[in-house]
Regions:
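Short, solvent-exposed loop/turn and secondary-structure capping segments
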Residues: 61-64, 155-158, 207
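C-terminal catalytic-base region of ester-bond hydrolases, centering on the histidine
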Residues: 190-318
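Serine-dependent carboxylesterase/thioesterase catalytic core
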Residues: 54, 93-188
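Active-site catalytic motif of lipid deacylating hydrolases and related acyltransferases
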Residues: 11-29, 34-113, 281-312
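Secretory targeting and sorting signals
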Residues: 1-9
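Active-site-proximal beta-strand/loop segments in catalytic clefts of secreted hydrolases
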Residues: 53-56, 77, 82-87, 118-121, ...
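Surface-exposed patches in mature extracellular/periplasmic domains of secreted proteins
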Residues: 83-86, 112-116, 259-268
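Extracellular/periplasmic catalytic domains that process cell-envelope and extracellular macromolecules
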Residues: 42-46, 73-74, 108-110, 135-139, ...
């Protein structure tokens, strides 16, 4: 069963109107072009191409090669993936520009609306892109967030009460200006089906419900893994890398009109230990490598005294 959507975010008057054209991308064009890789089947695809966006501390290979990309390859499902700057430990506003380009590129080569899938911070940068570059909304059919930090996390508020942290962590506080701006005006937009998945065992994105998005049930589904499989033990990392229920819900969203429908997912998925694409014989080492890489990159992230300043285009008066 889908959970009730959270209330819409607050202040809107200081932020850009939701339909004001977005700014020109500031990232060099060559860097943007190099950041997106697609399968041959993504070109002129008859199916909804999946664009995968990695989370904090990792690139698409570390995040998805051993799970999602392998599963989509096995199913012969068209997909693209975007590499974000600095392994996503810097300013999320910069990452969002890469996502804007990736959406436009994937839409252009596929010649039809696409799906965006992101885990943790990888579910946030696409929403920032959709909010401040409104042309991208007509290019996206589905958004799937895997424990996306949609309203910030109290863990970050506790860890960085006075700043002095990595840019992304300060921006993903529940009290951040970044989160307020991203959720201003509207959290979700007509024409896009939103599926936001969460787990009650999330150790990083808290409190429970902070992943939820507001909007009509016809196009917004907020779903806890435990509402389908009560014994599902996946945590924040598991929901984005190996959980079979999350994969089943995401693929349901991509292959049917509207957001994921929990009623359409067989409860037999609860008996699956790992999602398709994950090799049981290498799962432990693959997971360990993912955690090691992410932890190392986060540890090396530059510490800032305060949240990065919001860009001028974010505001009504710029």
């Amino acid at each position: 069963m889908a959970l009730a959507a959270s209330a819409s975010a607050g202040p809107t008057d200081q932020y850009a109107p939701i339909d004001r054209p977005g700014p020109r991308l500031s990232v060099p064009a060559a860097d943007l072009r190099a950041s997106v890789k697609c399968t041959p089947s993504a070109y002129h695809s008859r199916r909804e191409v999946a664009l995968l966006v990695p989370g904090t501390g990792v690139g698409p290979i570390e995040a998805y090669a051993w799970n999602w990309l392998a599963a989509l390859d096995k199913a012969d499902y068209p997909h693209c993936a975007v590499t974000l700057p600095g392994n996503s430990v810097g300013d999320v506003q910069e990452s969002a520009e890469y996502v804007v380009h990736a959406i436009r590129h994937t839409y252009r080569i596929s010649r039809s609306k696409i799906a965006v899938i992101g885990a943790s911070q990888g579910g946030v940068s696409p929403r920032f892109a959709l909010r401040f570059w409104p042309d991208t909304r007509a290019m996206v059919a589905d958004y799937v967030g895997l424990a996306a930090v949609n309203h910030g996390s109290s863990q970050n508020d506790i860890a960085y009460p006075d700043g002095n942290g990595p840019a992304f962590a300060l921006q993903l506080k529940r009290t951040s200006k970044f989160i307020e701006a991203m959720n201003s005006g509207k959290e979700t937009f007509p024409g896009i089906s939103y599926t936001s998945l969460s787990t009650s065992h999330d150790q990083f994105v808290t409190p429970e419900g902070t992943t939820d998005l507001s909007g009509p049930a016809s196009r917004v589904a907020n779903i806890s893994l435990q509402s389908i499989c009560p014994a599902d033990s996946s945590d924040h990392i598991g929901i984005g890398t190996s959980d079979a229920v999350a994969y089943a819900l995401a693929m349901n969203a991509l292959t049917h009109a509207g957001p994921a429908d929990p009623e359409a997912v067989s409860t037999s998925v609860c008996d699956q230990t790992l999602m398709p694409g994950v090799d049981p014989s290498t799962y432990e080492s693959d997971l360990a490598a993912f955690i090691k890489t992410s932890t190392a990159n986060i540890t090396k992230a530059r510490v800032l005294p305060a949240e990065p300043t919001l860009k001028p285009y974010v505001f009504a008066s710029r």
